[in-house]
């Protein structure tokens, strides 16, 4: 089994091939092999001659980096920057408030993934609405919400559609099925966002320090990575499609450094065991049918053109914003929450004065401390003993 992992991980990483003479491993552990991780880290040290800043755009990668101490294995010249890789975290405050408004209405069953229930809006959160007798339910698939609509014809069932390209096909399928079933009591509050436009927005910023990207493997498994080469060429940044396990991330970093050190700026696929260049074309076809590309506001970043998905004209009847007559209104972020700077990679979570004091998972100021993929939550869970005292001292 370990030989298979080696062959999957290291076919294209220069001339570096870790030894494979080891006993078989459990499949769940094979991409967490400590010896292979050390060998990858040594190779990164060997090839690194200059300082480089690499951003991961995936909350799962961020949590793996912090949980397994991947950044602590790297040479001092390598800085990992945590980007806007958590879809819950970038959902704008205004959209949370719209969800709260709908969920509090009588006759509504409001459904959502569990992560969204504790994300603070401007005054409260969905969990508090539920505690005050709002019918707020956690579902594990948008299709569960469709079933609820079938089972409760006298109720308005709303699903909060949040996520990157990864979850968009499931949301699209739910809308498609609702249309096929003729459900008049089902609608979607849509806040899906697209990753490539966000990368472009980050690179266009005058404050951007990013020199290479680890692209999210799960996003590319759906959408492929044909959108990335123009960005790599335009901004002269290596982009490596990367998985989520420690060996995946270390290899992705190594591939980035090899490109940076040799002056290349290309798109490479570290996660070839799960990602193809064209992605999942049937899923893409469904997304194109149900959705259209729209501007979308990202929490902490602002509006990014063509960075979101909204329902297409053929499925506009399922738009919860229109059905419930929700208008647009501006809401200011809490002044003492710096999650926007965290999402842009300008500061690390523990550099926020509120971290670990005024802001904890039990009493969060922002979504980055609530979500299972949030950078602040990762630092609090895995590093609070090493960073909280420093934060509190401020």
Language-model-derived ranges and their functions:
Residues 23-154, 168, 180, 189, ...:
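Metallocofactor- and cofactor-centric catalytic cores in central/energy metabolism, strongly enriched
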Residues 51-54, 185-186, 263-272, 298, ...:
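Flexible, glycine/charged-enriched surface loops at secondary-structure junctions
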Residues 58-61, 164-166, 192-196, 217-220, ...:
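Glycine-rich beta-alpha junction loops
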Residues 151-161, 166-216, 222:
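Active-site histidine-anchored catalytic micro-motif
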Residues 209-272:
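A conserved active-site cap/scaffold subdomain adjacent to cofactor or substrate pockets
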Residues 251-341:
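Internal helical hairpin/lid segments
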């Amino acid at each position: 089994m370990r030989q298979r992992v080696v062959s999957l991980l290291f076919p294209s990483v220069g001339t570096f091939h870790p030894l494979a003479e080891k006993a078989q491993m459990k499949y769940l552990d094979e991409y967490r092999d400590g010896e292979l991780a050390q060998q990858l880290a040594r190779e990164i040290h060997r090839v690194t001659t200059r300082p480089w800043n690499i951003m991961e755009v995936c909350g799962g990668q961020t949590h793996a980096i912090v949980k397994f101490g991947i950044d602590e294995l790297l040479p001092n010249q390598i800085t990992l920057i945590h980007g806007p890789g958590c879809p819950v975290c970038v959902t704008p405050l205004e959209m949370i408030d719209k969800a709260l408004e709908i969920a509090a209405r009588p006759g509504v069953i409001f459904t959502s993934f569990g992560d969204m229930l504790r994300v603070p809006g401007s005054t409260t959160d969905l969990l508090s609405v539920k505690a005050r007798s709002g019918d707020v339910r956690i579902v594990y698939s948008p299709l569960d919400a469709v079933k609820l609509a079938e089972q409760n014809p006298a109720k308005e069932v709303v699903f909060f559609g949040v996520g990157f390209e990864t979850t968009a096909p499931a949301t699209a399928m739910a809308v498609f099925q609702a249309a096929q079933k003729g459900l008049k009591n089902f609608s979607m509050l849509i806040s899906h966002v697209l990753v490539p436009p966000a990368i472009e927005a980050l690179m266009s910023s005058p404050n951007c320090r990013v020199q290479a990207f680890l692209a999210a493997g799960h996003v590319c498994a759906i959408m492929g990575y044909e959108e990335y080469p123009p960005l790599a060429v335009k901004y002269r940044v290596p982009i490596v499609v990367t998985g989520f396990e420690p060996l995946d991330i270390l290899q992705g970093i190594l591939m980035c450094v090899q490109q940076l050190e040799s002056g290349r700026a290309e798109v490479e696929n570290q996660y070839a065991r799960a990602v193809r260049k064209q992605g999942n074309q049937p899923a893409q076809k469904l997304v194109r049918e149900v959705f259209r590309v729209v501007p979308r506001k990202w929490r902490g970043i602002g509006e990014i053109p063509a960075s979101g998905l909204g329902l297409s004209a053929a499925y506009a009847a399922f738009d919860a914003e229109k059905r419930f007559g929700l208008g647009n209104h501006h809401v200011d972020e809490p002044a003492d929450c710096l999650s926007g700077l965290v999402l842009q990679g300008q500061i690390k979570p523990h550099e926020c004065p509120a971290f670990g004091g005024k802001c904890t998972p039990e009493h969060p100021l922002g979504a980055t401390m609530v979500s299972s993929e949030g950078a602040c939550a990762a630092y609090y869970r895995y590093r609070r003993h090493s960073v909280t005292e420093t934060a509190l001292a401020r």
